[in-house]
């Protein structure tokens, strides 16, 4: 009788990938990135172990939003105090923090737990083409 193989954190093989977000639809890009951050692309996926890869997203300022979401999509944040609710649309958020659109989309697609926060820490988003992770020799990840 076979038993399920349990993978430990030490046995995981983490790789580095770089994704070019230029011309990519935000949600489709975020779902692929979230899947790789969790490690769901690996045949030995274990939900309670951080076995995801490190992902570098470049050109995050050139990601595409479909339909009228550029003006209609609202991002909310709260200070926690009465009257402390702030709202900003996607166009203004892109102008203020170009990397935040991709970060918020990916963050919503990974678990909201301690492990999810650790996996989210393996995401590096840059607005331009330049990044400082060349020493890790990242492989190019094509998003269809």
Curated annotation (Swiss-Prot):
Q: Which GO terms describe its molecular function?
A: mRNA binding; structural constituent of ribosome
Example GO CC term: the record gives: cytosolic large ribosomal subunit
* Source organism superkingdom: Bacteria
- Note the coiled coil stretches, chain numbering: none
PROSITE patterns, per the entry: RIBOSOMAL_L13
Listed A to Z, the keywords are:
Ribonucleoprotein, Ribosomal protein
A GO BP entry is: translation
UniProt record similarity statement: Belongs to the universal ribosomal protein uL13 family.
The cross-references to PANTHER family, in alphabetical order and at most eight, read: LARGE RIBOSOMAL SUBUNIT PROTEIN UL13M, RIBOSOMAL PROTEIN L13
Q: Which HAMAP family match?
A: Ribosomal_uL13
Assembly: Part of the 50S ribosomal subunit.
Q: What does this protein do?
A: This protein is one of the early assembly proteins of the 50S ribosomal subunit, although it is not seen to bind rRNA by itself. It is important during the early stages of 50S assembly.
According to UniProt, the name of this protein is: Large ribosomal subunit protein uL13
The organism of origin for this protein: Mycoplasma mobile (strain ATCC 43663 / 163K / NCTC 11711) (Mesomycoplasma mobile)
């Amino acid at each position: 009788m076979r038993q399920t193989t349990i993978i430990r954190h030490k046995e995981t093989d983490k790789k580095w990938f770089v994704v070019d977000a230029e011309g990519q639809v935000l949600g489709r890009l975020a779902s692929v990135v979230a899947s790789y951050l969790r490690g769901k692309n690996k045949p030995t996926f274990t939900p309670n172990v951080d076995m995801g890869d490190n992902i570098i997203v470049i050109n995050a300022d050139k990601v595409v939003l479909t339909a009228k979401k550029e003006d209609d999509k609202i991002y909310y944040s709260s200070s926690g105090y009465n009257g402390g609710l702030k709202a900003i649309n996607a166009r203004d958020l892109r102008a203020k923090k170009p990397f935040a659109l991709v970060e918020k989309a990916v963050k919503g697609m990974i678990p909201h737990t301690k492990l999810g926060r650790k996996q989210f820490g393996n995401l590096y988003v840059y607005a331009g083409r330049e990044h400082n992770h060349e020493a890790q020799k990242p492989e190019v990840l094509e998003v269809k």
